[in-house]
Amino acid sequence: MKRRRRDLKQAAESEQEECQSVPQVVSLRDSDQLQIMDEKGDNSLALLPAKLPMRMCSTRERRKYTCEIPPDLLMEIVMRLPAKSMVRFKCISKQWSSLISCRYFCNSLFTSVTRKKQPHIHMCLVDHGGQRVLLSLSSTSPDNTCYVVDQDLSLTGMGGFFLNLVRGLLCFSVREKACIYNPTTRQRLTLPAIKSDIIALKDERKDIRYYIGHDPVNDQYKLVCTIGISSAFFTNLKSEHWVFVLEAGGSWRKVRTLESYHPHAPSTVGQFINGSVVYYMAWLDMDTCAVVSFDITSEELTTIIVTLEAGDVALPAGRMKAGLIQYHGEIAVFDHTHLKEKFLVDLWVLKDAGMKKWSKKRLVLQPCQKHLVHDDIELVVKGTTQDGKVILAPVNMCSQLYILCYDMGSNDLRKVEIKGVPDIWFDKECYFDLKYSLDESEDVIYLET
């Protein structure tokens, strides 16, 4: 009996020694310096010798073994954590919350080369009854031949129309209001409605589009709104533009236009956000297509008419099928109007925005890939991937949801399946939109308005 008690006592002492050698949970305390605390929170940085029992140390003795982690090193350590973990760790202390929430730290996430970045696709589904869902898709294969819905990130009741994004922030419209959503922090903002100066009369069409961009000079996120009102065939065009700075006390402010300004109707598709510049397609009339650029910093609007070459026939707005893409760092109009009938694509590249010069390039689909383009499925441009492939998606959902990726360099068209979409969305007509995340970054900033 005594021997058994002695064995139990030795086992308990051994277990206590092992527990003392285990690294303690790190935290920060409310001080001017970033420090790591011990499990009781009594001292900075519990880097004590493993053989020295913590309970036998006085506060003065433990401080003798304390050392400080430099703030820049601590920031480097935190930056290697997943974004979702950063959000959870904000509750450790006020100092951690201040570090992770500060603008400098958030901006460093977009320039860090040590962070593991994974491209993904955001997809919105909206039915006629107003039911919505926001899905997040990621690739399951190295060659990106299949994207699967992450069920843990699926949000019912989230999402809307005309999805676009910048630096990890999603922008979409719900009932003519702009909504901002941060998938990392799960924060959602609904901005107030705009009191427009132009009113749509009976039988007139009203188009409202929201775009989000980032001002790198003032480090501000801004929302741009274009409102266009027109009669049939884009006659009697009127348009105006508004800006909202995402900061405390922000409000809609009307943009002043120059005398050379062209009223226009924003296109349903055809938008591209290059961080500090927003580009979108528009129509000046039924036969004149243009690209409108809005500089987020200077808040200047520029209208660039897509000029035709000799022998080209202008397509009316109702027939032209095109979208904006990025082509070797330049803005381009990807015109796939004749893709299904003639298996060709016209690419209009903006060579000089200041001089408004365009360059045309024609691409012809390989004969062995013509079966990927069906006559009964209408396609729409959904942007470009990080490696320059154009994303084409069906306008309407089908039982086998997919996208087409077109490599303009090798003239190769590939089909990419999308799996995991709830079956209930295939049994009804719904609005379907998706955006490929070009910057691959996540933002942990908390937005205030």
Swiss-Prot record:
Occurrences of domain F-box (ranges): 63-113
Gene3D superfamilies the record matches: 1.20.1280.50
Region: Disordered, residue numbers: 1-21
Pfam families linked: F-box (PF00646), FBA_3 (PF08268)
Record InterPro entries: F-box-assoc_dom_typ3 (IPR013187), F-box-assoc_interact_dom (IPR017451), F-box-like_dom_sf (IPR036047), F-box_dom (IPR001810)
Classification via PROSITE patterns: FBOX
Signal sequence segment: none
Matching NCBIfam families: F_box_assoc_1 (TIGR01640)
Name the UniProt record assigns to this protein: F-box protein At2g40910
Species of origin: Arabidopsis thaliana
Lineage: Eukaryota, Viridiplantae, Streptophyta, Embryophyta, Tracheophyta
